């Protein structure tokens, strides 16, 4: 599992520069997902989307990252609210591919792969670039006592590891 995650990240970072970049003046970025996007258990300014926005600003990328995470959301829920959560003009979506599926599996709901495929197809159909939220087994040591949600440091690690892919997507 760790090997697969590392391989996914390695391949993603290799191809990121080859993918279409978005002009910074037109960049609107939306992070969508469940509680680890929303920042459950930490302040909104400590959630990874806000930290990522700050890191982008420090690198001279003055873009806004909208946090459209909802604690307890499922992939079906994300699909249902996709058009309102990701407004017209959005160029990049940072997609939590795990949290919503975890919530639904825990409740015995839906076909997670089909729902994720539908989310991605709808976003691509609108010309929106998708960057998956970074996950790694190393994050386990940065979870709150509930064993599910990131600590502030966990959020910082997610933002730090997503930064290169997002930097490659906005110029």
Q: Where do the protein language model's features map onto the residues?
A:
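N-terminal secretory signal peptides that target proteins for export/translocation
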Residues: 1-3
């Amino acid at each position: 599992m760790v090997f697969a995650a590392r391989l996914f990240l390695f391949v993603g970072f290799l191809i990121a520069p080859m993918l279409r970049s978005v002009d910074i003046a037109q960049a609107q970025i939306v992070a969508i997902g469940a509680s680890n996007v929303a920042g459950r258990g930490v302040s909104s300014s400590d959630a990874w989307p806000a930290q990522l926005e700050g890191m982008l600003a420090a690198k001279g990328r003055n873009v806004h990252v909208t946090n459209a995470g909802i604690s307890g959301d499922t992939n079906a829920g994300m699909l249902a609210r996709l058009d309102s959560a990701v407004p017209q003009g959005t160029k990049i979506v940072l997609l939590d591919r795990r949290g919503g599926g975890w919530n639904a599996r825990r409740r015995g709901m839906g076909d997670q792969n089909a729902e994720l495929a539908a989310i991605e197809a709808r976003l691509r159909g609108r010309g929106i670039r998708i960057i998956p939220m970074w996950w790694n087994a190393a994050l386990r040591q940065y979870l709150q006592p509930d064993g599910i949600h990131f600590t502030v440091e966990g959020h910082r690690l997610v933002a730090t590891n997503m930064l290169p892919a997002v930097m490659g997507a906005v110029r």
